Amino acid sequence: MGAAASIQTTVNTLSERISSKLEQEANASAQTKCDIEIGNFYIRQNHGCNLTVKNMCSADADAQLDAVLSAATETYSGLTPEQKAYVPAMFTAALNIQTSVNTVVRDFENYVKQTCNSSAVVDNKLKIQNVIIDECYGAPGSPTNLEFINTGSSKGNCAIKALMQLTTKATTQIAPRQVAGTGVQFYMIVIGVIILAALFMYYAKRMLFTSTNDKIKLILANKENVHWTTYMDTFFRTSPMVIATTDIQN
């Protein structure tokens, strides 16, 4: 679902819409006595996630289910194309559902209605229920804050749990990539600094610390290359002195 920061934004938006839909469509309220309480919430592998439980209970379990699905649909519709592209993989990993960007809403609705209307869920009369999530990751430098909304019914809580499984699965896919990406960027920066430092030292040595052999080479390289005809010109530039034989005899 895009960057890890977008996950937190999506979580917040989803929670707000669920609360609003439950209030509007299922007459839920934070003051209503809940028939079911959340006893414990387990995250088997928690890597930086915080959790709070919020009660929004009512007596209409079917309306709760519809409200949760409506909130999920609206939230998905508000995602960017890049974020939507992540969702099918999240469905497969979290709920074992094969889906696509175009059918994800319908497939999720079918999954929730089949699962949450099953006898195993409907006949669960436990007044205190526990919720178990496999794993959750926080974004680099900041935790992911989750909110489980207790609807007060097994049906409603079943739908909420399905959404939370998707959300936490998204954190396991995005946050580790960001950590890995941060590490790669760090090493690339370090390597770049080392290369620049090596180049600086090389040129500094050439400029400030020149050996005797290098100095000789530089002098010879800068010395003018004199052509052989120049030496002949120099030799014949002054007329030779003529000595008479009489002078020698005397």
Curated annotation (Swiss-Prot):
GO BP, one annotated term: virion attachment to host cell
Main location: virion
Identification of the protein by name: Entry-fusion complex associated protein OPG095
Modification after translation, per record: Myristoylated.
Lipid attachment, kind N-myristoyl glycine: 2
Membrane topology (Virion surface): 2-183
Keyword Lipoprotein: yes
Location in the cell: Virion membrane
UniProt superkingdom: Viruses
Induction / repression: Expressed in the late phase of the viral replicative cycle.
UniProt source species: Variola virus (isolate Human/India/Ind3/1967)
Source lineage: Viruses, Varidnaviria, Bamfordvirae, Nucleocytoviricota, Pokkesviricetes
Chain ranges on the Intravirion side, renumbered to this chain: 205-250
Family the UniProt entry places it in: Belongs to the orthopoxvirus OPG095 family.
Transmembrane segments: 184-204
